[in-house]
A protein has these predicted regions:
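Catalytic activation segment of kinase domains across protein kinase-like and atypical kinase folds
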Residues: 205-244
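Juxta-kinase regulatory segment immediately upstream of eukaryotic protein kinase catalytic domains
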Residues: 1-24
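Active-site activation/catalytic loop segments of kinase-like enzymes and analogous catalytic loops
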Residues: 229-273, 288-307
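Short secondary-structure junctions
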Residues: 16-23, 76-81, 271-272
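ATP-dependent phospho-/nucleotidyl transfer catalytic cores
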Residues: 2, 27-31, 51, 55-62, ...
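ATP-binding pocket architecture of kinase catalytic cores
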Residues: 43-135
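ATP-binding glycine-rich phosphate-binding loop
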Residues: 21-42
Length: 346
């Protein structure tokens, strides 16, 4: 979340420009780290979400607006519950508040893994028939793992405060894995894995659920063309993890097979559009997505912690080690994971 503070008067002026003048309370909302988000209460009893887009992360505000408006419009036209944009005044936007929905920050039981996988599979499926033009790439090369490797190689040259001396084991792991990093991009270039519209941030807290089980996928700022496998891989990384992303005790870090099974079951039940090559690479995508985030943390550590917020000196290194341990855990269970995919792939 941005450290920027706003007075009630400033927020009132912004809301006035969007047609809201009867607010009774405007307060910080949610646990996001990128945009500034506020919940707006009004005298009418109507609630809104007011959000300021972080233009450092999303410099092309018009492309972002076009993406969000097209995605939400397409979903709502099909009768699919979605965010409703009330007004835009870049870099600010106003959403209708989704009453009756709740979210979770942690997957605490296997059924929740199933639900999140079904929700994102349905999201991809619902956007599969979006008409041209092609959506813009909000963050170019976001899941281009070879390019992330290039960035790590550059970070090694920076070697902030001689930190490279602390990561010999991690760098050896990276080098052993380097040959795998272009696998999915090569398959896409060869036309074996198609480009699809993907979410690119498939954490459980980006799925809101109503009492009747209706799910709404939120945080649409990274929706853009990509591989469906990037979305599934990140679900494996986040929703099958036994420990937090920055757990220091690596003995607690592993991928839970019962959670992976529910992810695979839910995703394959909902993602009937997947071709055989995509299904063949579902387990690999979990490893690759986790490795990719690991090298991003490692690169940031070697550059002096310039991108990810850190709470202490070696925070990014701890995060990188956790991701690499997750990769090893998935590899250790790979035969079992592949058997699970075979069980549900149809």
């Amino acid at each position: 979340m941005s450290n920027r503070s706003y007075t009630q008067e400033e927020l009132a002026d912004i809301l006035k420009g969007m047609g809201v003048t009867d607010q009774t309370d405007v307060s910080r909302y949610g646990s996001g780290h990128i945009n500034d988000t506020f919940k707006v209460e009004t005298k009418r009893g109507v609630r809104f979400i007011l959000q300021r887009i972080n233009t450092d992360i999303f410099p092309d505000a018009e492309m972002l607006k076009d993406t969000v408006m097209r995605v939400t419009g397409h979903l709502r036209a099909k009768g699919v519950p979605s965010l409703e944009v009330i007004a835009y005044a870049n870099p600010w936007r106003l959403y209708a508040f989704l009453d009756g929905y709740t979210s979770r920050d942690v997957v605490s039981e296997p059924r929740q893994a199933y639900d999140v996988a079904r929700a994102f599979a349905k999201f991809q499926n619902d956007l599969a028939d979006m008409p041209p033009p092609r959506l813009g790439e909000i963050i170019p090369k976001f899941h281009d793992t070879p390019d992330r490797m290039r960035q790590l190689d550059e970070a090694v040259k920076v070697n902030y405060k001689g930190r490279l001396a602390n990561v010999a084991k991690e760098m050896a792991f990276v080098e052993a894995w380097r040959r795998n990093t272009s696998r999915l991009s090569d398959l896409m270039a060869a036309g074996k894995i198609p480009e699809r519209i993907t979410h690119n941030d498939t954490k459980i807290n980006n799925v809101l659920v109503a009492a009747d089980g209706t799910a709404v996928v939120i945080d649409l700022d990274t929706v853009m063309p990509g591989s469906a496998l990037s979305d599934f891989g990140d679900m494996v990384r986040t929703s099958s993890a036994a420990a937090a992303e920055d757990e220091k005790d690596l003995s607690k870090v592993y991928s839970k097979i019962e959670y992976f099974e529910q992810l695979a079951k839910g995703y394959l039940e909902g993602a009937k559009f997947l071709n055989d090559c995509e299904k063949d690479n579902l387990v690999f995508s979990g490893k690759l997505a986790t490795f990719e985030v690991g090298i991003r943390f490692l690169a940031d550590y070697l550059k002096g912690d310039t991108y990810f917020h850190t709470a202490y000196e070696d925070h990014n290194l701890v995060r990188a080690r956790t991701q690499f341990k997750m990769v090893e855990s998935i590899e250790a269970q790979e035969a079992e994971y592949e058997a699970i995919v075979k069980k549900y792939r149809g």
